[in-house]
C-alpha cells in the first residue's frame, strides 16, 4: 500500500488477511524491491541504515506506523532506522516541519503516534498554525516555543534536506523503506514490506561482514 506522488486521493485497497508475507527466498530484485541507482550515501557506514519515507498526512503511513514501530524494536544494534517526511503535495509539505519540530523539542517519541491519531482518528489535520499551536499546548509543549521552532531556519533546512533525499531516492509513493542506500521497498502490503526488509537487512549484514 502506498500514497502515490501522482495521486493525492488515497486509493485504499485491502489485500486480505489470507495474504501472508512472501517467503524470504521468493523475494527478488525488480519484483519485491528495486536497486537504488545511483546508490545513496548513508550517515553511518558502519551501520545498516533503514529509512522510512512517510507523511503524517498519509493514511497508509498511519496504518503502517505501529507495525514499523514493533519491527524497529526487534532490530539488532547494527540497524539504524531514520525517517524522512515527504512533501509530495501542499498539505504534506505544510506538515513536514512537524516531525523535525517534535524532534527538536524532545517530544517525538512521546507524541509521534499522537500526531497520526490526531489527524486520522480525530479529524484535526493540523493544517494551520493556530491548530498546530493549540495541539502543542494541549500536549504539554509551550506554544510559543513550538511555533518558533516550527518556523526556524534549522527546521526549514532539515525539511529542504528531506526533499533532496526524497528526490535522490526517487521515491514514488509512501510509505516506502530504503535499506542502506541500496534497495527500495514500496507498494507492498505492510507485513510483506517488513518481511522484505528483514531479508535485505540480512543481505547487507552479510555483505558488510564479507559473507555472500
PLM region descriptions:
Residues 46-47, 57-65, 88-95, 104-108, ...:
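Solvent-exposed, acidic/flexible segments
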Residues 57, 68, 72-75, 102-106, ...:
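Sec/Tat-exported extracytoplasmic proteins
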Residues 55, 138-212:
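C-terminal cap of thioredoxin/glutaredoxin-like
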Residues 2-90, 163, 167, 205-212:
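Extracytoplasmic thiol/disulfide redox context detector
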Residues 65-72, 95-99, 112, 129, ...:
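Extracytoplasmic/secreted envelope proteins and their assembly/folding machinery
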Residues 29-32, 122, 146:
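Glycine-rich, flexible loop/turn motifs
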Residues 74-105, 110-136:
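Structural microenvironment flanking redox-active thiols in thiol-disulfide oxidoreductases
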Amino acid at each position: 500500500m502506498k500514497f502515490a506522488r501522482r495521486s493525492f486521493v488515497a486509493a485504499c485497497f485491502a489485500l486480505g488477511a489470507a495474504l501472508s508475507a512472501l517467503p524470504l527466498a521468493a523475494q527478488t530484485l525488480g519484483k519485491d524491491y528495486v536497486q537504488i541507482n545511483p546508490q545513496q550515501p548513508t550517515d553511518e557506514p558502519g551501520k545498516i541504515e533503514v529509512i522510512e519515507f512517510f507523511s503524517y498526512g498519509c493514511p497508509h503511513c498511519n496504518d503502517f506506523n505501529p507495525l514499523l514501530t514493533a519491527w524497529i524494536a526487534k532490530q539488532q544494534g547494527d540497524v539504524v532506522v531514520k525517517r524522512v517526511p515527504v512533501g509530495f503535495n501542499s498539505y504534506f509539505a505544510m506538515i513536514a516541519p512537524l516531525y523535525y519540530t517534535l524532534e527538536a523539542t524532545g517530544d517525538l517519541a512521546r507524541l509521534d503516534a499522537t500526531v497520526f491519531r490526531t489527524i486520522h482518528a480525530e479529524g484535526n489535520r493540523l493544517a494551520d498554525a493556530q491548530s498546530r499551536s493549540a495541539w502543542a499546548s494541549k500536549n504539554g509543549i509551550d506554544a510559543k516555543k513550538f511555533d518558533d521552532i516550527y518556523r526556524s531556519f534549522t527546521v526549514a533546512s532539515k525539511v529542504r534536506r528531506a526533499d533532496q533525499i526524497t528526490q535522490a531516492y526517487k521515491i514514488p509513493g509512501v510509505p516506502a523503506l530504503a535499506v542502506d542506500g541500496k534497495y527500495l521497498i514500496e507498494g507492498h502490503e505492510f507485513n510483506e514490506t517488513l518481511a522484505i526488509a528483514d531479508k535485505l537487512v540480512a543481505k547487507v549484514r552479510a555483505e558488510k561482514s564479507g559473507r555472500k
